[in-house]
Amino acid sequence: MMRVPVENLGLFEQLDRIVVAFFRKQQSSSPYDLYVSITQEHVDQKKQELEPLGYQAVKLPLGMALDNVIQQAHFKALIIGGLAPEEIIVSKEALMPMKDIVDSFCIMYAAANNRLENGKAYELMKDKTVYFIGKLLTDSLKKGDEISYMGIERESADGTSYEAVKCFLTKESAEQYNDAKRPVSHANLAYLKAFWGNPVIIEPHRNYWIEFK
């Protein structure tokens, strides 16, 4: 088993990847590690090893497996199999900096799969920080800075087009779509929506995108 810095694992890029996690069927009185399998070979190996010990295999997105380890007291670490020749162990503490991002992903994923109403999703996300390509009117503006945002053309149900503000969960995610190398800024989601007076769309290039009008 090996330890790898969490920032080197690229977990954010794989949040919606379907994995197999092994949960105990009975509630445990002592904390245990959550095993997650990325490959079928590792799934088969872990089933043979863990099912006789009272574990069951559950398919879910990697982001939800991370959320379980972060939020639930009875998990002490995440063990990932299939990413490298050896299993990789990541402690709960190492995952904590991802807590807000993982929480946002779970909300967005549930809404994208019609398990959460858009309005409820907004209530859960409105106080979160998001990133956008551009600048707001702030004290940190320098001469030559432009108050602007990068938008995306959208089409409403009646066929009319409108523009939504592109937002992202991380600065690194925003930079992937920032070919013009404009400033990347962060802001409270509700404030950003009110400031521009436009709909916002979060992670528009991913399968779990969400839009708030």
What is each PLM-predicted segment?
Residues 1-213:
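An interfacial alpha-helical scaffold signature
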